[in-house]
């Protein structure tokens, strides 16, 4: 069960979300749908579908993502998360989340103050430095941070990031991508295309490698 819970946290906390935010500009009044697959140790075990909706000013308003994971047709666990974020000027101002992690429930809230974040996780107060950033791989700015925090528990995570250029084949197309390797308290590798859209996310857990590959 420990491995399954790590798989849940590693692969799905970022994906099974309902997010409201204001960030980068796109064409107004449209929605995008993207699909991908989840692999564990190279074997396909699940799927990902997320929809981005844009407001009248072209800002991202909502990001809805659903994912499932099973082996041999058996559902391994249940993970659901509703997450609300508000961003201004490229910075997170507040966040609210409710998560069910295979029967364990988390309720978290976070507000940005003048110098730090103040929040609550399951009725326990917490504080985070003002420069902490959510561990959300859909957001390109995650690669510019040294202090992240867990979206479910709000636990701070110190990271180091190394960047490199690569090419990747997706649906028989060769893409130029940026690769970012996270080490420290959070170990992951993330690939973005030239439009700074997420292409691939890989995360090691004890004895396994979990990969999420988005379709073109």
Model-derived regions, located:
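Short, aromatic- and cysteine-enriched interfacial helices/patches
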Residues: 3, 69-77, 148-152
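N-terminal mature ectodomain segment of secretory-pathway/periplasmic proteins
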Residues: 30-34, 38-113, 196, 203
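Short, acidic, Ser/Thr-enriched surface-loop or helix-capping motifs
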Residues: 39, 169, 193
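Boundary at the C-terminal end of the N-terminal hydrophobic targeting segment
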Residues: 22-29
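N-terminal secretory signal peptides that target proteins for export/translocation
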Residues: 1-8
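Solvent-exposed helix/loop surface patches that form functional interfaces
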Residues: 29-32, 96-177, 181-183, 202, ...
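Bacterial N-terminal signal peptides
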Residues: 9-22
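Low-complexity, intrinsically disordered Gly/Pro/Thr-rich segments
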Residues: 186-188, 192-202
């Amino acid at each position: 069960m420990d491995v399954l819970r790590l798989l849940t946290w590693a692969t799905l906390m970022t994906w099974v979300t309902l997010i409201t935010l204001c960030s980068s500009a796109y064409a107004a009044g449209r929605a995008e749908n993207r699909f991908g697959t989840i692999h564990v140790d190279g074997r396909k075990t699940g799927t990902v579908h997320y929809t981005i909706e844009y407001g009248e000013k072209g800002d991202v308003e909502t990001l809805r993502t659903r994912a499932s994971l099973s082996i041999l047709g058996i559902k391994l666990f249940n993970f659901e998360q509703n997450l609300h974020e508000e961003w201004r000027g490229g910075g997170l101002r507040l966040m609210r989340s409710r998560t069910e992690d295979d029967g364990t429930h988390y309720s978290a809230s976070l507000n940005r103050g003048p110098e730090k974040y103040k929040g609550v996780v399951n009725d326990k107060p917490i504080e985070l430095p003002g420069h902490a950033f959510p561990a959300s791989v859909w957001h390109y700015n995650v690669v510019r941070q040294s202090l992240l925090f867990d979206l479910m528990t709000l636990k701070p995570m110190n990271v180091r990031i190394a960047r490199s250029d690569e090419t990747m084949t997706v649906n028989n197309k060769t893409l130029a991508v940026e690769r970012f390797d996270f080490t420290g308290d959070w170990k992951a590798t993330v690939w973005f295309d030239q439009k700074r859209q997420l292409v691939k996310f890989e995360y090691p857990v004890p004895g396994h490698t979990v990969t999420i590959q988005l379709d073109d």
